[in-house]
């Protein structure tokens, strides 16, 4: 059993967390891009990003394991070098390319809480996760801002226990149904849904699917003092429901309200529309781009 990781800093429990940054494809601001990160910071939100590995082992800020949905290229992210990925433009972005985690850390620089998801590399939430966690730990050792790391796969976080013990670590969780997780064996799905990896991993928090927050396992985790975040609400109504049990929400598809007393946040300014003469994010509906609706 691992020692419990540090608790989440208070900043993660205040301002809502922008899922993959504050993105809006209609305005050329693509998920997990530098523009989406800047917009989230300027609006006073926390930030969630996703990490996939390059062929060279570098940590790239990108959600999918293939390039097809978000670029004009095809094929696996892990088959390209960081240098090559850094030259690939994100579609409809006006020329933005895929950033590294190091670039995003330098951009955020402690100005917003940063929640990092390590994407599963095993394919079935098993132990074959490769060295991605080691690279992330290496990058975070000297980072001074509020940051936490999480994954659906507990094995993806194992290297951080020793390599980055001061970084809060948590699990992304849900009910793990066979419909949504067909490659994961039934016994493993049951263990994940029951949150049996929390204690062995020493996880300080969970981020749980918002519709399943009343799960007995979630309520037990909360009673044990673990912070409960949730994913991914897409309307004020869903946020209100989720906040009955969750300590904070991860959101997209609308503009969540930032509490005036949100800990660890500077006073938010209106996040600008990046288009010349744009109306500004807060003056119009935030449009949800097409793409996967999972975490």
Question: Whereabouts are the PLM-identified features?
Answer:
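Phosphate-group recognition and catalysis centered on beta-loop-alpha active-site segments
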Residues: 1-295
């Amino acid at each position: 059993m691992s020692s419990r990781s540090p608790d989440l800093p208070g900043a993660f429990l205040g301002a809502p967390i922008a899922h993959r940054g504050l993105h809006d494809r209609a305005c050329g601001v693509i998920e997990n891009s530098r523009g989406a990160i800047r917009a989230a910071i300027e609006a006073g939100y926390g930030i969630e990003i996703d990490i996939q590995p390059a062929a060279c082992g570098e940590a790239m800020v990108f959600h999918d394991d293939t390039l097809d949905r978000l670029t004009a290229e095809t094929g696996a992210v892990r088959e390209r070098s960081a240098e090559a990925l850094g030259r690939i433009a994100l579609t409809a972005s006006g020329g933005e390319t895929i950033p590294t985690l190091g670039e995003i850390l330098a951009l955020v620089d402690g100005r917003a809480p940063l929640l990092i998801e390590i994407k599963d590399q095993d394919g079935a939430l098993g132990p074959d996760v490769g060295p991605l966690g080691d690279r992330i730990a290496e990058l975070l050792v000297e980072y001074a801002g509020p940051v936490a790391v999480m994954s659906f796969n507990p094995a993806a976080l194992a290297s951080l226990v020793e390599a980055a013990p001061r970084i809060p670590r948590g699990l992304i969780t849900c009910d793990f149904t066979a419909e949504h997780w067909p490659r994961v064996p039934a016994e493993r799905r049951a263990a994940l849904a029951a949150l049996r990896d929390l204690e062995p991993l020493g996880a300080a928090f969970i981020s749980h699917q918002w519709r399943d927050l009343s799960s007995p396992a979630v309520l037990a985790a909360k009673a044990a003092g673990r912070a409960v975040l949730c994913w991914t609400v897409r309307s004020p109504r869903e946020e209100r429901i989720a906040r009955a049990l969750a300590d904070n929400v991860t959101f997209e598809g609308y503009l969540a309200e930032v509490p005036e007393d949100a800990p660890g946040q500077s006073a938010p300014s209106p996040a600008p529309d990046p288009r010349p003469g744009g109306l500004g994010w807060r003056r119009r509906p935030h449009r949800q781009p097409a793409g996967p609706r999972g975490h």
